[in-house]
């Protein structure tokens, strides 16, 4: 399969045109992906991302959205700055622009986070996992409360507890 060089998409919206990604990339043959754009996530408008969505976790007024960086295509986010009081980024860089925040130079992993504090105090987080970590994400509900676990162990849960099953004497969950 051949690679596709200098790939960039142009999305024309009512009031603006998005170029996704900002810099043209090479897409390896056989690669497939879904990049979200113009999507409201708990009241924060994600204008686009070159990361793939996995799942979300609601914790009271706060919400966390999990994404992963796929097939060596650099992850980037463009988030509307409307209704955002503060933005913090770990393991990446951001700059405020006229229409929002541009986040790039991500180092994917469990600690790669974007935290947007909305004007009402609610927090919306974006976690950018590696492709491998995305294979080990588990989501469920215990006693009416959602949970997300990242572990390469097998996982069983019921209404009371989570059990990790692994041949190793100790295992890790995040």
Regions found by a protein language model. Give the residues of each.
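Non-catalytic C-terminal accessory domains or segments of carbohydrate-active enzymes
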Residues: 2-174
């Amino acid at each position: 399969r051949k690679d596709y060089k200098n790939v960039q998409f142009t999305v024309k919206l009512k009031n603006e045109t998005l170029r996704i990604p900002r810099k043209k990339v090479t897409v390896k043959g056989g690669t497939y992906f879904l990049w979200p754009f113009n999507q409201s996530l708990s009241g924060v408008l994600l204008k686009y991302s070159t990361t793939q969505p996995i799942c979300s976790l609601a914790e009271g007024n706060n919400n966390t959205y999990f994404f992963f960086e796929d097939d060596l295509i650099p992850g980037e986010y463009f988030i509307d700055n409307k209704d955002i009081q503060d933005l913090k980024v770990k393991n990446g860089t951001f700059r405020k622009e006229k229409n929002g925040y541009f986040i790039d130079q991500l180092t994917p992993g469990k600690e790669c986070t974007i935290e947007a504090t909305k004007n009402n105090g609610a927090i919306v987080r974006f976690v950018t996992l590696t492709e491998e970590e995305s294979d080990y994400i588990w989501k469920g509900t215990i006693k009416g409360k959602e949970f997300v676990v990242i572990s390469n162990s097998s996982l069983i849960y019921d209404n009371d507890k989570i059990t990790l099953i692994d041949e190793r004497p100790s295992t890790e969950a995040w």
